[in-house]
Structures are given as structure tokens and as C-alpha cells.
Amino acid sequence: CVLCYRAQSVDRILYLIGSFEFKGIEDFEKSFEKSDFGEWLKKHKKFKVECLRLGSHDFKSVDIEKRLVNFINKKYKNAKFGMKLYEIIFFVHIINNNCYVGVDFAGFELNKRAYKIFLHPNSLRATISYALAKESGFQKDEVLLDPFSRDGIIPIEAALYANDFPVNYYKKDRFAFLMLNLGVDYEKLFKGIDRKIIKKSKSGIY
């Protein structure tokens, strides 16, 4: 939950429940047996499935989504699939011939920022901009000068880092983990993190 709220260098935050290698699409249903869906479906009956693929395959992401939905519906009779009404998101991440299955804690792409309203044609991804700021060796009490700032993504990401400002401060109500029964007081969690925001940073960012 904390990573979803604060992390600047990630696209997704998943709780891993299974992983396997495969040769073809026919391997998936048997391999899904290795993933612990049951523990999560005890508390969350309505589910959604998403899939993201990297690499060349003879199937589409939607094919894997359908197979996982069918697998869960067959094995867990009380579970119900829903595109809009759901309590938990099972996310399938495929990289070449490796598959990772997890619970999506964010529910949206964490590389997208609330401050990016109008995009520059050559705008960098926020995650890359943060990585560049860190790669430069920038520290929280130092000065950062970006003479080629364009739409200012690198300085903005550096400022968020320098002030310990949660990158998803304005998306508190959008997280998928808010629907999960984790026994966490989310309001208290957010307030605890927000209290650590540095009001007046010692760094200079231009």
C-alpha cells in the first residue's frame, strides 16, 4: 500500500501469488493451478482479470484473460467475474515465456501522473524522469538545474523526491487495495505518510 502511494519508479505493484514458464497457450490452465487464488477469493468474491504481455506470442492478452476467468469460475463456484463491479484484480504479467500472476494493489498505471494534463510531443515518462534524476546523483539538499527541461518532468519528479511528497497524493481514492480486506486503517496510513512531507525543502530545483 505504501509503495503504491509513494513509489516513483514503478508501473504496477503486484502481490505475487504464482509464476511459471510456458511453451504455448495450452500450458496456462494447468499452470494456473499453482497460483493461490483461493486464499484471496475467500474474502473477495467479485473479481476482475487483466493481462499485459511483453514479447512475441501466438495469442493475445484477451485470450489469457478469458482462460483465467474460466479457470476461476470452474474451480471457485462462489466467485463472480465483473468488468466494472469487482473487489479484487488478478493481474497476469507475461514476459516472453515467463508468466507472473498477482493481485494488483493499485488498479491503475502508476507511471501516469496527475500533474501531466497537456503533454509535450517529446515528453518523457515520469518513471524514466525520476530514474534520470536519481542517476544524476541528485540528493535532497542539493541544487538541480535542467537547462533542457521542456515540460519540466525531470525537475518535477526531483521536487517530489526532495520533499518526500507522495506521487499519488491526489489519487488516494482510486487505489484497488482500498477494496481489499487487509485489516489496514487506510486513512491513518495516508495521514502518517503525509505528515512526513517536507514543507520547505533545502534543495534548489530550476
Describe the function of each predicted region.
Residues 78-91, 144-148:
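Short, surface-exposed recognition loops or helix-turn segments adjacent to catalytic cores
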Residues 60-61, 112-115, 157:
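A short secondary-structure junction signal
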